[in-house]
Amino acid sequence: MHQRCFGLRASLSIFKAFAVTLAASVFLQVVYFLSLLFMSFRPTRESDRSIHSGTRQADQPQKRDRDKTEQSNVPKLDPRRKRRTP
């Protein structure tokens, strides 16, 4: 009698573990899908942001100046020495 009861408990715990694993998997897939869905609506590039934020073409020279400044701040590799130049 005890063996039958133990077998039922074991199969019930295996079923519970399977159900919990399946529920967690479905939950993670739903969260991942929703994150992809919401990320597709967010602008990713600077040009996309300017379209969505309503900025005009007059703001473009500032962006170009900022890009030049950012590029000049990047240390460059000296091809002969393989080190960064100051």
Swiss-Prot record:
Swiss-Prot/TrEMBL keywords: Cell membrane, Exopolysaccharide synthesis, Membrane, Nodulation, Plasmid, Transmembrane, Transmembrane helix
- Any transmembrane segments, and where? 18-38
User: Biological process (GO) annotations?
Assistant: polysaccharide biosynthetic process
* Positions of the UniProt region annotated as Disordered: 44-86
Involved pathway(s): Glycan metabolism; exopolysaccharide biosynthesis
Q: Where is the signal peptide?
A: none
Tell me the compartments it is located in.
Answer: Cell membrane
Topology relative to the membrane: Single-pass membrane protein
Report biased composition (Basic and acidic residues) as residue ranges.
61-70
Q: What is its main location?
A: membrane
- What's a GO cellular component annotated to this UniProt protein? plasma membrane
State if Nucleus is listed as a keyword: no
What function does the entry list? Inhibition of exopolysaccharide synthesis (EPS) and nodulation ability (NOD).
Task: Identify this protein by name.
Answer: Exopolysaccharide production repressor protein
Gene (UniProt): exoX
